[in-house]
Design a protein with these regions (language model features):
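Long, charge-rich alpha-helical interaction segments
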Residues: 103-148
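Gly/His-enriched, cation/cofactor- and phosphate-binding structural elements
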Residues: 129-198
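Short, functional N-terminal and low-complexity linear motifs
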Residues: 22-29, 126, 156-162
């Protein structure tokens, strides 16, 4: 069993059950883990540092074999400094780095929403399409799915950016997003943008 990017603390009961059934579990995450069980069948790579994301942890485990995907994932987790630091190990143009940033953001964006029907792609289907690509830049350049994600993201963000705060002061603002699919999709990336830009 491979578990990526979900809190061990929140999912501890399921983890304990899997280990009790003698499953082998590979667990990589950057969220609060609580007490990590000591078990021969558990390999846990956990780092709760705010500058670390699961993609960077997996990249370390894989010794940089898929660094381009790690950079993409770090951008998707809104860790731009981490992504740029990782990207120093790549030989790519500034334009390509920008493409990895966009793709990471779009992958993250496609994961928000309480129902798969709200999303542009079922995350499993998107994963399979990404996996079929030779790498993230191949996906950006050659997959029509990239354009679908890009268009959806831009349209949803334009709606979000048109919202006026219910309340604002010099240190905070409160926004109410409508109960619509676009708002559910954009909630995470819009929050990231607000945090990054303010």
């Amino acid at each position: 069993i491979t578990v990526l990017d979900v809190s061990m603390d929140t999912n501890r009961a399921a983890l304990d059950k899997a280990l009790a059934s003698n499953a082998t579990v590979f667990y990589v995450d950057h969220h609060f883990a609580g007490d990590i069980p000591q078990h021969a069948n558990l390999t846990a790579i956990i780092n709760e540092s705010p500058e670390v994301c699961t993609a960077a942890l997996v990249n370390g485990y894989l010794k940089g074999r898929h660094l381009d995907w790690a950079v993409t994932g770090a951008f998707g987790d809104n860790l731009h400094d981490t992504a740029r630091t990782l990207a120093k190990g790549l030989t790519i143009t500034a334009e390509d780095l920008s493409s990895l940033e966009e793709l990471g953001t779009y992958i993250n964006y496609n994961g928000y929403g309480p129902a798969i029907e709200d999303l542009h792609f079922d995350p499993k289907e998107l994963y399979l399409r990404l996996y079929a690509a030779e790498g993230p830049l191949d996906f950006v350049r050659n997959s029509p799915d990239f354009e679908k994600l890009s268009t959806g993201y831009r349209e949803d963000m334009a709606r979000a950016e048109a919202l006026q705060p219910l309340h604002a002061n010099p240190t905070s603002a409160v926004f109410l997003l409508p109960e619509e699919a676009w708002a559910r999709r954009v909630s995470g990336v819009y929050s990231n943008d607000l945090a990054t830009n303010n």
